Amino acid sequence: MIENKVELVAELVLESIGKTEVVSRHTEGTKSCQVSFRIKDSPSEKGSTSFLSELVVIQTLDDNDKYTVVIRHGTSITMACVVGYSDFKLPTELKWPLERESLPVEPDLKPIMTQLKRQTAGSADMPKFDDEYQAQARQNQGTAPLNPYPGLTVTEPSFANPAGGYADGDLYPVGTSHPDWSGGLPNPLGNPSSQGGMIFDPNRRPAPRREDMPPGWMPGSKYDEPFGPGSGGFGGSGSGGFGGSGSGFI
């Protein structure tokens, strides 16, 4: 039989631990309760049948509905906390004494995750992701193996995709990924028929514009917007630099 709140709190703490076997109980009035118990089905040590633990529940001095809970095993404290009487799922009114078998032991927990709403499939004309490497198109090029390095010029005759990599005209000096050095160094101003390309310019002075100096800014090739400040647009002299006339790259 449970005579008061401190015994009830001790019983509820034991229920929250799991299957326990009470060895002894000792209650001092309505202020403290001491319980020695073993946890059932716990791994045993050599020379002992199971772990013997001790639960101590003490009512705090400043609040009658707050209790200090301490669980220790030997000289080691495994848990120490303060719990409130209202933290447990209990009826609004309790009639003393209580039967131990009729204690509410189910926790009052609400599900944290809710079921996500299933998204409906979009229409056929809804745009998909930006397929800059033509990944979707390459799936329909037959049974030949695909290049495992999309965007690079690494290729083999057995690969279905062409040898040219993505954006070769922009990523490589003078607009080509494999320039022909047999005729000497290429023209630093670029081939007039070339589409241009980015190239490191050690002589370029950093522009004072903030858009040219984002976090982590490094000197070198920068893209100058075709219709922005300093750009000549299509066909003009612009600020093409090494990339060629009007290329937009400086």
UniProtKB/Swiss-Prot annotation:
Compositional bias per record (Gly residues), positions renumbered to this chain: 229-250
Residue ranges, compositional bias (Basic and acidic residues): 202-213
A single GO BP: chromatin organization
Record keyword Nucleotidyltransferase present: no
Gene Ontology MF terms in the entry: proteasome binding
Cytoplasm found in the keyword field: no
InterPro entries: PI31_Prot_C
Pfam families: PI31_Prot_C
Span list, region Disordered: 179-250
Keywords carried by this UniProt record: Chromatin regulator
Subunit structure: Interacts with the 20S proteasome.
Family: Belongs to the proteasome inhibitor PI31 family.
Additional information: Present with 358 molecules/cell in log phase SD medium.
Free-text function comment from the UniProt entry: Plays a role in the establishment of transcriptional silencing boundaries, preventing the propagation of heterochromatic silencing.
Protein name as catalogued: Silencing boundary-establishment protein FUB1
Organism, scientific name: Saccharomyces cerevisiae (strain ATCC 204508 / S288c) (Baker's yeast)
Gene that specifies this protein: FUB1
